[in-house]
Amino acid sequence: EVCEMIYNSKRIILIGSDEMASYFSRMQIDFYVMGRLVVKNSIYKTNFFTPEKDDCVILLSMEGRIVDLNPWLLDKMKENNPKMITIGHYDYLQDAYGLTIPQGLDEVLENMILDYYIQEITYYYAENYL
């Protein structure tokens, strides 16, 4: 389902804190090689751009602090009704597709699960949508 959302989108927009966004680097490169436009968006108002309807936004936030500290962010992300995917402990966007990472695990395990999700999305897309 995630790959279908990505396939049917004009752009893939990755949003996460600076620490979490580093996990997107390999995914961004892999999808670029597959001919897809992948953009990392900022969580800061001065640099943020509003996703369009035909975009797919992937929001990575383990604890949800990115949303708690930036209450304007969700409204701006959802403004044009793009496809939305969240990755983290909470599915704080009820109308988004959520990939949940269990809370209370060791940080190493959390990172392994996150890496697994990103690899699965990338490899499944390469195998089934190219």
Residue positions per predicted region:
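Glycine-rich phosphate-binding loops that contact phosphosugars or nucleotide phosphates
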Residues: 7-130
